[in-house]
């Protein structure tokens, strides 16, 4: 891998996900080759914990990770879960994303809040909640943002960080978000 996008501790082990690195000599791209999640085995040893599809409709480029309900969850643009032995497709966190935006859909963050796995999305800065199986429900959009890069729980409340305005918002329930600050607010 050239880039590590996500790390998580699951089952007492460290897991890492990222890109596929450089293509083999003579090839221009990695078309069709799976993405991998690696498990740290100690010292300098890592093993492949799983291979995720690179082709649509169930593709997954490990960009975000979270641990929830006894499983490791990995996302971008779709979400997969790992129970320590087997990987399972958990759907596409679409929410209310318009049909024309679906080819661009990406998971940029994962977090657990009030017993549900949440995904922070691009291109519309939506938060989408996993409701079981391959099902997801929209939890609202953050202002005029385009991407949710960070989700966290603080003092029992859910917070999200979005670009392009460096905005931090708090979830107030159902589909309501309150903007706490825009760190980048150019005129116009």
Where are these regions (language model features)?
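Trp- and S/T/G-rich repeat-edge/linker motifs of beta-rich repeat architectures
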Residues: 1-5, 9, 13, 22-61, ...
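Divalent metal-dependent phosphoesterase catalytic cores across multiple superfamilies
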Residues: 18
């Amino acid at each position: 891998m050239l880039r590590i996008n996500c790390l998580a501790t699951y089952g007492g082990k460290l897991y890492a996900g990222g890109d596929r690195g450089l293509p083999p000599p003579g090839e221009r791209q990695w078309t069709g080759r799976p993405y991998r999640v690696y498990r740290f085995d100690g010292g300098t040893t890592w093993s492949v914990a799983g291979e995720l599809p690179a082709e649509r409709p169930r593709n997954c480029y490990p960009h975000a990770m979270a641990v929830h309900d006894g499983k490791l969850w990995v996302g971008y643009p779709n979400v997969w879960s790992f129970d320590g032995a087997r990987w399972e497709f958990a759907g596409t966190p679409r929410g209310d994303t318009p049909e024309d935006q679906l080819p661009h859909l990406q998971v940029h963050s994962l977090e657990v809040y009030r017993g549900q796995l949440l995904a922070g999305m691009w291109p519309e800065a939506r938060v989408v909640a996993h409701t079981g199986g391959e099902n997801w429900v929209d939890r609202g959009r953050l202002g005029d943002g385009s991407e949710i890069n960070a989700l966290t729980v603080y003092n029992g409340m859910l917070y999200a960080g979005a670009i392009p305005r460096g905005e931090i918002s708090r979830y107030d329930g159902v589909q309501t978000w309150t903007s706490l600050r825009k760190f980048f607010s150019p005129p116009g």
